[in-house]
């Protein structure tokens, strides 16, 4: 594609972004924003008409000078000054109003935008976060929002005012003299050409600057999260070099963006001064030669016309320079808005499920399952049959079957090949294998964080694609290897598993997980405030809270994704007793580094490069003397 075509597409994209942004602002403030526009227009008109009062005053002075009678001039001048003062007072009041209102509109719009972005982010699939750096995502909430703030609060109102002033002053100049207006038009055409030439390059680099800023912030966030690893491997110099490379790219595009922006104003300022001189020369020559004036007012060309015309020329050129200055801020704001809209336009996680999870009870008269409006401790799948319209209640038992499943994180690279897994209600099924064998991938598919490429997954005989994702995930308690604790009290973090849980239920869950003992020894017990992902706790303590969080949800099925791999041996013994109680009567999928945690599993599935190579319980697999036997005896390593 040619550079011209690319530039044209970029202009069209920015135009669409501006239109969408303005529509959005009017949608947020349908009454206040039009009032602001009216206030800005009023201020612009008032700022433009000063020259007309100067012309009237000069006309009065000229007539009095010629007649020698100054008595009639005094009341006329006083009237002009009083009128001008009243008009400017209205302008000041209007300016105060729209500036205060614009602050409300700006901050309110940004608040709503942040809400929209965060809500959209909650609807995005896990795949989005796998392919986007967290720092780049955070940049939407910081840099992009900040550039948008400057644009909405300052640049857009000033740009509108500048355009109104230019249009108003231009028509006033036409009213006084068409001949001198032609000189203005010729000069403005050249100034517009320079603005377009330099401004387009500036806009291109400002957009690149926002993108590179997101890359730099993403890299900083990544290194900060892995700071221990950087120091452990003595890679400080490598990290610095990687950062310098990204920072250099940001410097290059920022330098070019600001270079074009900074040279534009002096050039336009000098062109404006040159135009002022040309208009002054033209006016003087016309006066000296007695050239007949052509104007909408019909006035003859005189000092009373030329002097205010020169003032308007200076004002006109100054406003052209203001436009070029505001355009840079607008372009930066549009670059930020475009990135924000890209996030808002991301496709949400698809969910065509219609089977829901409900509290159930047995009708004493019919002995049939029915939906209950309160917590009964019994769960059922509410399955509407679309063909007949009948509703079937299927007991949630935790019977899960994966039938010949293929899956790849990218279409051209499969990581699971023909995997078939079955778990009977209440069974403990363990996945073992080396890193990359596909253990965690299987649990991601059970949760429907990703959708399979081929095959079927059935939960209690129901295709999981028919089950609403939120209900499917509510039926599965999850303990992840990477623990995330949120800013809040210990009680809040335990309750995260079930926001309706009482304090007593949270404490009971903590006791089950073996976390109550250390929690009660914290300075404020369950009211101890956690910050920085629970940085004041040990890895084992954080893991125990994560397990308690899963326990308070009281899920019918559990996924333990390498739950005890980061816990010391003593803590593991504490956890294991609680976990055994938690797993009673529940279908449980376990992934662990230590084979001691899976020895009592009903079924152990051995994976290698996305394929199941062995299945059986511990004794059966030891007797086979195959892959599991090699792992157990230390001939192979689990990781």
Which residue stretches match the model-derived regions?
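Transmembrane helix-loop-helix hairpins at lipid-water interfaces of multipass membrane proteins
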Residues: 31-97, 174-179, 281, 290-303
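Membrane-integrated ABC transporters
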Residues: 1-47, 62-83, 98-102, 106, ...
